[in-house]
Amino acid sequence: MTGRSRWRYHFPSEDYSSCQGVQLDEGVLIWNKLPDKFAYIKSLVFTSNCQDGTPLYSSFVELEDECPYLPIVAFDWNSYINNDGYTGPFKYSIYSVIYSVTANFIITVFLTVIVFINVPTKPSRKASYILKLGALLASLNLSIFVIRVWKNIAENYTYNGYVSSTSFLNLLWGDKVFAGIDLVVVFLLQISQVQIVMRFFDRMQEKRMVFYFGLFLILVTQILWVIPTLSPVPTKDSDSDIDILPPFVYLFRIALSTCYASVICFHVLTKKSLCFRGRMIFLTLLTIFTVFLHPTFFIVDVSNLWIDDLSEIFNTTCYLASTVIVLEWTNRIHTMERKIHAASVLGRPIYEDEEQNFHFAIYALRMQNAMKMHRDGHVHDHGHTCDSNDNANVSLQNANTNDSSSIITDNSSQRTSTFGTMATDQVTLHTQQGERNITQFKRAETFWNKCHHVLESIVYYTDNVMVNALAGSKTFDSFTNDAEKLLKTERLRKTVGLDEPEDVYLYRKTTMSSDSVME
């Protein structure tokens, strides 16, 4: 029988006399394979049907016309099925194992179908490709394993007339392909859980920190877990250095699942006005149940040996359920929040780190120019009234200062070029009536420019920090001074912003009245 990790508790094995052989006295042996179907035997050693030192017989009700068991065999069989040990009672039989594995397989396939056929509304977010791949691999892995189990059970029952739960456990524990695919599935589902936790935070810096920290913990857990899983099983008399690794990693997995459940429950408490409203009550309770099912299952796995035997199958289903159901719950909560933000006056909160490539500022300036164009066209349609008002404003501005004429000419010239500005995606000059915006936008750098900047930084710090610290700065006196001067000049131009002359700078001019200053 394939053994598990030695850190778990194992019930002491009992010795059954019927499995070791029973000396029978002389008598008549009736056997179908004998020439005359029966024979007179003076002495015979009878060995019962046993596997791994435990008897194997049918638990069905015996018929009255059947031959009874030998007294020693009947005694061993009754003591085996009635003791409180491991694999003896009916709950450890093959029937309970088959029912549990089949139900677990159906739940996994059901969750996989939900992942693929669920079409969320537009504000929601569909399942990621990582979650889809993990769910698909989990279903395929369990499907192949269940088919192998059914085939093995059918063959054993056909040729032997009995089926033992130990044969199923040997097939589960000895299948390295199943264990390897299961590790990949758990890794993908844990990545999906990290993505769900990232959605609970609004700032990009917080999301980035959650992703890096979660990915680090997942990699450490999977690397430590794969070592004892794929390593040879130690024997009873041998000592191994990796015996301490499985319990440590198992406790680490319990801690990770508990942290995930704590984050979900904290988010439920912060959004309790949305979580416990109408149809969301049932989904919220189901979410809490699934996230707490995983740490509870881990704890029960340590204390219950029957769950310990099937832990690799149950763990995958728990990971998948705590990911798929929480994702659906998160989508609905975010949909309700966006509806509330859309109905409010201020909308949703916007943070500084969301302003990447100045999308909000560019959008605001374009909308401002569009409104100004619409207003100018409306004024032009009204005819002489608007023209007289503009002429009056021009005369007042000419009387106040000499610079106002340049402002008006600039405004008129830029009104004619606004259509060209809106047609291109480049950031150009945006103006308002009577003022200018002081804005400078950074242009998105190409990939090769970023690589060039990284290479320049590496060369700079290598030359000036590492090499000078080891060999001294006088070692590089043989190089030409012109190249160093050009390099310093280029850095200075980059520091003050002169390396990008095509960037547009907008300045704001205001007119001041001398009367207001004197007052």
Curated annotation (Swiss-Prot):
InterPro entries to which the protein is assigned, alphabetical: PalH
Any Pfam family the entry gives: PalH
Superkingdom in the source lineage: Eukaryota
Keyword tags: Cell membrane, Membrane, Transmembrane, Transmembrane helix
Residues exposed to the Cytoplasmic side: 118-126, 198-209, 265-279, 331-519
GO CC, any one term: plasma membrane
Keyword Acetylation: no
Transmembrane segments: 97-117, 127-147, 177-197, 210-230, 244-264, 280-300, 310-330
Ranges of the Extracellular topological domain: 1-96, 148-176, 231-243, 301-309
Main location: membrane
Function: Required for the proteolytic cleavage of the transcription factor RIM101 in response to alkaline ambient pH.
Similarity-based family: Belongs to the palH/RIM21 family.
Protein name per UniProt: pH-response regulator protein palH/RIM21
Source organism: Kluyveromyces lactis (strain ATCC 8585 / CBS 2359 / DSM 70799 / NBRC 1267 / NRRL Y-1140 / WM37) (Yeast)
Classification lineage: Eukaryota, Fungi, Dikarya, Ascomycota, Saccharomycotina
Gene name for this UniProt entry: RIM21
